[in-house]
Every structure is written in structure tokens, then in C-alpha cells.
A protein has these predicted regions:
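Alpha-helical transmembrane segments and their lipid-water interface positions
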Residues: 108, 186, 246, 333-336, ...
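Membrane-water interface of transmembrane alpha-helices in multipass transporters/channels
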Residues: 306-321, 387-399
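Hydrophobic packing positions in regular secondary-structure scaffolds
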Residues: 1-265
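Re-entrant/interfacial helical elements at transmembrane boundaries that shape
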Residues: 319-322, 333-344, 419-423, 434-435, ...
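Alpha-helical transmembrane segments in multi-pass membrane proteins
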Residues: 33, 289-297, 320, 324, ...
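Non-transmembrane, extramembrane segments of multi-pass ion/lipid transporters
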Residues: 121, 248-282, 331-357
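Juxtamembrane "helix exit" motif at the C-terminal ends of alpha-helical transmembrane segments
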Residues: 294-311, 374-388
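Membrane-interface segments at loop-to-transmembrane junctions
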Residues: 276-285, 349-364, 394, 398, ...
Length: 459
């Protein structure tokens, strides 16, 4: 699919360069606005306005919403007042609010000046809500019905108002003071026994809703759980103020998943895409965690230094340090990723900490015994018999295997408890991911290793 689109993209760019605008326009009108928006990423600045003006009015607005902020800003700066007004008239309020948030102050002033008073008021209302809240994510363009309306009256209202609404599949039944009473789907209206049936007789009551202050991540999870197409947003007095649509919830899911992946990789989350980020942008997001992890690794060095005398007496112990540290880090990462994912899907609660610990301890014991047994045979057969390393006695083999088994158990416990602890303290559990846990487990595995060596070998 990607290869086919790349071929089409090259063909369209060639038409643009050859100034075959009529042919190009005919092809663009058959394409999805999302795909058209992707074409602008490969254009030079002077080509962007040329291609955009080839699009029909409605398609131009839909494409504009999906474009990168840099291209949007370039177009706005080149628009006449009439052109800007035409694009804004075709935008939904939530898309216009997103546009305002992305633009610099001088561009924002021009957008608000050209927007009609109703849209300007709605944009300002959305922007007053906290960032990443349901209020900031919602749109006010939905179909509302009254309790006393009939099926026939409701269908007429949908026909009259639906063209400007973001979704018409679910309609919201409100009282006189705009309190949410229930929902009615278009299917309910079409299948009603009579056109004179009142809405209150066929509506679904006890509607699931969110408040304007709810976190957008929690809102997105509700879409995943209940398979909504749209979710009503109410204020503290249960008055309807807007809806969050499925496409916006999907954007939040993608954004949150990307953020978690970046945090788990020891990076500060970035709002820019990879190709739009400069080397200095990447540096700023990576260096703080790298510095922290480098400094924290000092403890590992201190442990090795404190046991220099033991290593001097039996240098063969040094050869197995990387294996112990890597195995411990891998085990801790497995547990942490599993728990972090379960927390993000709301499969785990803080009250489940002892259940998680008991499950991970049993898993760790099984893994530890298996790894220690294989390690014992490997050291005996490979290091002692094949490589003829006489310094590796059965006692040394025992030290290595015991340290490995204990390290696995400790790593699993650290990996499962730290994400839960982070959540309890109000941090993102993804912070306690592989790099951070590996650093802790490295220090613990060395400590266990050398303590076993001193105790069993008498070093």
C-alpha cells in the first residue's frame, strides 16, 4: 500500500512540476483528504499554495486540517482575507481550536479576526479548558433534541442542522436547561413504529458521559472500552457542552502510546515528528535521561571498585559480570513492560500489588532455576572442559549460578513494583521502564555476585 502511494505521489509531483494543473486537479479530487495532505510534505514552499488552490472548496478545508502546522502557517500567511474566511467556514470548531493552538500569535490574531463571531466564541471557550482535558478535546457541533419532540420533528431537525455537525449518528436529548437526559441514534429514529412517537419513549437513558475536566487519556480509554462513536461532555451540573468524537479519541490514543514509548526509551516526549525534528531537538529530548543514567551507573562502578581485591585473587569472576548484568536487566525489563502495559489498559490497580508480586515471584523462581541449571552446565562444559579454564572450579560455578538465580528473582520483583510505585506517587509508570530498571538491577546483581563470592570462596 505504501509503495503504491509513493508511486502515485511521484506521478502527481511530476504533473505539478510540468504545470499540468487540469490533470492534477482531476486526480486530486478523487483522493482522500488525508492522502492529499500527505503530498504537501514533499513539496517545496513555493509549490504548496499552488497545489492547495487546485483543490475544491470542501476538499481544501478537509485537507487543510490534516496538514502539518508548518504548511498550514505558510498557507495562512499567503491567503487573502476572503480565502482564509472560506477555509475557516468549512472547519469544525475543534479543528479550528487545534489550529489556533499550533500557530504563532500574529497568525492567531488573523485567524480570530476572520472567523465569524460564533466560531470565535466557541474557540475561546474550548481554549479556556485545561490542556489535555476533555473540554479542550471536544467539539460543540452536535445535534441536540428536546424531550417533547416527535420522531418526525427530530428527523427534520437532523436534515436541517446535520450538514454543519461533526456527527449525526448519535443525537443528544436535552431538557430546557440543557441537562443531558438521554441519547437517540439515527437507527432508533428510522425504526420507530410511528412518526408521532415522542423521543422520550425511545431514547436511551443513563448515558455514559465525561466532564470537561476529565483527562483526555481516560476519555480515549472509554472509547476503547465501550466502542463509542461519540461521547458527550458535560459540566459539573450535568449540562451538555459538547462531544468528543472517535477520530479525536484515536489521535489521543496514538499520541499517548507514542509518549509512553519515548518515556520507556528514556527520552523526553516530543510533539514533533521524527523527520521534522532537528538534531538539536533530538539532543534536547535525549541528553537529560542519558546524563541521569550515566551518573546513576556510578554506583555500579563503586561496587566493582570495592571488590577489587576479590577480583584480583580470582580474575575469572570478571568474565561472568556481563552475563549477570544483562540477564538481570532483561528479566527486569520483561516484568516492567508487562506491568506498565497492564496499568495503561486498566487491567491492574494499586490494590493488586501483592497479587502481582506473588505472581512475579513464582515466575522468577521458575525462570531462575531454569537459567541457573543451563548456566551451570554451560560453565562446566564450555568454560571448564572445552576451554580448559582451571580457575573455574565447581565452587566458582556454584557462585555464578546462585548469583544468577537470585538476580533473576530480584530483577522480576524490581521490574513489577517500580511501575506500581510510580503510579502511586502520581508519576507516569512508563518512567520506570527498561533503562532505569536496568541501572538498578545492574548494581544489585553485582552486589549479590560478590557477596556470594566472598561467602563461598572466602575471598
Amino acid at each position: 500500500m505504501a509503495e503504491r502511494f509513493e508511486i502515485v505521489e511521484k506521478a502527481l509531483l511530476k504533473l505539478l512540476e510540468e504545470k499540468k494543473y487540469a490533470t492534477l486537479r482531476d486526480i486530486l479530487t478523487t483522493m482522500n483528504p488525508m492522502d492529499v495532505a500527505g503530498l504537501f510534505d514533499g513539496l517545496e514552499e513555493k509549490q504548496i499554495p499552488v497545489m492547495f488552490r487546485l483543490l475544491p472548496k470542501e476538499q481544501a478545508a478537509e485537507t487543510f486540517v490534516e496538514m502539518e502546522p508548518e504548511a498550514q502557517q505558510l498557507l495562512i500567511q499567503g491567503f487573502s482575507d476572503n480565502e482564509l474566511r472560506e477555509v475557516l467556514d468549512e472547519l469544525y470548531v475543534d479543528d479550528a481550536a487545534d489550529l489556533v493552538e499550533e500557530m504563532p500569535a500574529n497568525v492567531v490574531r488573523r485567524i480570530l479576526t476572520q472567523a465569524d463571531p460564533e466560531m470565535r466564541s466557541s474557540i475561546n471557550q474550548i481554549l479556556r479548558y485545561p490542556e489535555n482535558s476533555a473540554g479542550a478535546l471536544m467539539t460543540m457541533e452536535y445535534v441536540s433534541l428536546r424531550l417533547d419532540m416527535t420522531v418526525e420533528e427530530s428527523i427534520l431537525r437532523i436534515r436541517r442542522q446535520g450538514v454543519d455537525k461533526e456527527t449525526i449518528y448519535t443525537c443528544y436529548v436535552l431538557s430546557a436547561d440543557r441537562t443531558l437526559q438521554g441519547i437517540v441514534t439515527v437507527k432508533d429514529l428510522l425504526l420507530a413504529e410511528s412518526d408521532d412517537t415522542e423521543i422520550k419513549e425511545i431514547m436511551t437513558e443513563n448515558v455514559i458521559s465525561v466532564t470537561t475536566q476529565d483527562d483526555q487519556e481516560e476519555v480515549a480509554k472509554m472509547f476503547s472500552k465501550y466502542n463509542f462513536l461519540a461521547l458527550p461532555v458535560v459540566d459539573t451540573e450535568k449540562r451538555m457542552v459538547g462531544i468528543v468524537t472517535f477520530d479525536d479519541a484515536m489521535d489521543v490514543m496514538e499520541e499517548e502510546a507514542t509518549e509512553d514509548m519515548e518515556i520507556m526509551a528514556a527520552m523526553t516526549p516530543s510533539e514533533k515528528s521524527y523527520l521534522k525534528s532537528t538534531p538539536f531537538d533530538l539532543y534536547k529530548h535525549r541528553i537529560p535521561w542519558l546524563m541521569l543514567l550515566m551518573v546513576s551507573a556510578t554506583f555500579t562502578g563503586m561496587i566493582i571498585s570495592s571488590f577489587e581485591s576479590a577480583l584480583a585473587l580470582l580474575p575469572a569472576l570478571t568474565a561472568f559480570i556481563p552475563m549477570l548484568m544483562d540477564t538481570g536487566g532483561n528479566c527486569g525489563s520483561q516484568s516492567s513492560v508487562t506491568v506498565i502495559r497492564a496499568l495503561s489498559l486498566d487491567e491492574l490497580e494499586l490494590s493488586d500489588v501483592f497479587t502481582v508480586l506473588w505472581k512475579e515471584v513464582r515466575t522468577a523462581v521458575l525462570c531462575g532455576i531454569s537459567l541457573a541449571a543451563v548456566c551451570f552446565l554451560k560453565v562446566l562444559l564450555v568454560d571448564r572442559l572445552l576451554m580448559h579454564n582451571e580457575s573455574i572450579s565447581l565452587s566458582v560455578d556454584l557462585v555464578i549460578c546462585l548469583a544468577l538465580g537470585v538476580t533473576v528473582v530480584m530483577a522480576k520483583m524490581v521490574g513489577c513494583t517500580l511501575p506500581l510505585l510510580a503510579k502511586r506517587l502520581g508519576f507516569d509508570p512508563a518512567v520506570m521502564a527498561s533503562p532505569f530498571i536496568t541501572t538498578i538491577v545492574d548494581a544489585l546483581s553485582l552486589l549479590v555476585y560478590f557477596l556470594f563470592a566472598k561467602t563461598i570462596l572466602g575471598l
